[in-house]
Amino acid sequence: METLQGRKPKKPHYIPRPPGKPFKYQCFQCPFTCNIKSHLFNHMKYNLCKNSISLVSQRMEQTGKASRASQHSPAFSHNSKELPLDAESTKPIENVKIEKAVTKEAREKPQSPIKEVSKDDTEPALEAKDKSEDMDIAQNKISSAFSPVARTCESEALSLSPHKDDQSTIPHFYQQIAPWVTSASSAHLLPPIPEYPPYMVPERSLPPLYAPYPHNQASTPAYQVTPRETQRPLVPSPLIPPNSSLLHPYHYRYGHSIFPSPPLPYSFYQHPELSIPLQRSRYLPLDVYSSRFYPREYGGHLVPLTHPESYSRLAEDRAVQEHNTGDKGIRESPLEGCDASGSPDRPSTADVTQRIPVGLRLASHGESHSGSQSHIISGSTKANDNLPKMPCGQNQEKMLQKTERYDSQTTISSRSSDISDKEEDEETEEEIGPLNLSKRDQATSNNMTHHHYPDRELHYDSESSQEEAPLNLCLRVQSSNQALPNTSETPEKETISNAEVSTTESPQDLEPCDQRQTAAFALCQLASSRDIINDTSVKQQDVTESQNTKCLPSPDNCSVKDSPNILNASMVALGQKRANNRPLRHTNKRAKVKEPSRPRRKRSQNC
């Protein structure tokens, strides 16, 4: 056996401890270490020592195998030869001294029956001690490298631990007779305030909820399902009692309701202080939503806005769209109202300056146009009796004075302009040109001009003659008395009415100031754009056909067609120059006014 111990084994997978050097650390046999603490810490960091100890104890409990080591010579491990030295180092010093003395006596002294008896008596005691120590070592040993080598105190603790585990394998809750019932304290949780009792103070006859059951009630389940008669619904006591004194006159064992009240009905609770009922309409009003939406058409019906003041242009656009629902063919730009001259990302200057008067002009034009159509239906021939109601509230006395004044005034230049108008209208009726002012029935149109147009012409001249000043063509915001009457009728009709009234009624000349103003204004309006001419020609045809068939034209068409004419006229008038007399207009018109009108429109946008 000494030869086996002296032979060096194969190189193990771990570095063994040197034979004469005592180990310092709890876990020596690690795959990482010899005696260096840094290597050992890597093993102890992952709790491999505790896992190996628990695995050894469980395996020894399951198998119950004892070590095959001999009684005198310790077991030899195939991993290393230093394991017996480790096992011997863990033995108590007293046992080592006794073993040495016994071996010396057996070798030196001769054999005798008396000595043999004494030796036989001592050997069972030694064998019992060796077996107990071998069992302790074998429980901690395993063939793997993770078998720990513990100290004497730890080996004793480990040897006692499986016996304790055997006793406590059954849970305490399922034991019929629990060993800790008598030693357990039945102290209850104290309330935070000693004056006030807790929610339920149990009686001595009742078992407490959190104390262990006595021996006679061990068979009962842990949780009692059926409530007892003495148990009542737990109501917490109020923090501040209604009594004047802070202390109760007597303690409540159970929390009773101090103020008995009937049970609350299961219905909708109506607070007495609320005057407004809580049950309201399920839908919010449209005012909440419509402040940010743009007015739109749904099937020909316009949905108005409830808060139009949130946008600056909504009032004008809505008025334009109300007139525009009748004819879907004519479409203007929604932000400009007249044409798409302005760029989409920035407004034009004409649009900014004319913002306020446009909405007023549209409203006033509706009244004046309705008044003018009533004159067409009546068919009366007196211009003085059929004066329309002016939107600005002008006196009719001034109008009568103006009519008397213009009955005695005509000019030769106006006659020539009227003749040239008729010749040009006959030419433009055959070819579709930019300036189409054709009248199919001259008789009906002449009658119409006697009935309808003089009122408009007198209205315009009355306004222009109040201030004996040159014509103001700027786009600044004008007063309502000056801005509104200009839009009562299209400028083409005004110029035609000026010419026709002057030829039929009086043979005298106009004043030079009035002649210059009317000529310049008519020239500016005629040269504005092609759309104005087309709209006016269509409108005149509608008026003549309606008088023949006694059908009224829709007010929507007229009002919508007038609104872009006004804005176009005001925009083009920025860069215009006044002409001196009427015949210049006809010479330019016969030479195709298309080319000079284009740079004028561009100049008006830049102003």
UniProtKB/Swiss-Prot annotation:
Which UniProt keywords are present, listed alphabetically? Activator, Differentiation, Metal-binding, Nucleus, Transcription, Transcription regulation, Zinc, Zinc-finger
Regions of biased composition (Basic residues) lie at 579-592
Please, one GO biological process term? positive regulation of transcription by RNA polymerase II
Q: Which InterPro entries match?
A: ZNF750 (IPR039363), ZNF750_Znf (IPR039064)
The main location is nucleus
The entry's Zn(2+)-binding residues are: C27, C30, H43, C49
Report residue spans for region: Disordered: 60-133, 318-467, 482-511, 575-607
Cellular component terms (Gene Ontology): nucleus
Where do the TM regions start and end?
none
Q: Where is the composition biased (Polar residues)?
A: 60-78, 496-507
Q: Where is the composition biased (Acidic residues)?
A: 421-432
> Zn finger regions (CCHC-type) covering which residues?
25-51
MF terms in GO? DNA-binding transcription activator activity, RNA polymerase II-specific; promoter-specific chromatin binding; RNA polymerase II cis-regulatory region sequence-specific DNA binding; zinc ion binding
| Locations listed in the record | Nucleus
- What Pfam families does the entry give? zf-C2H2_7 (PF15269)
Q: Basic and acidic residues: which segments have biased composition?
A: 79-133, 318-334, 452-462
> What function does the entry list?
Transcription factor involved in epidermis differentiation.
In its UniProt entry, what is this protein called?
Zinc finger protein 750
Which source organism?
A: Danio rerio
State the taxonomy lineage. Eukaryota, Metazoa, Chordata, Craniata, Vertebrata
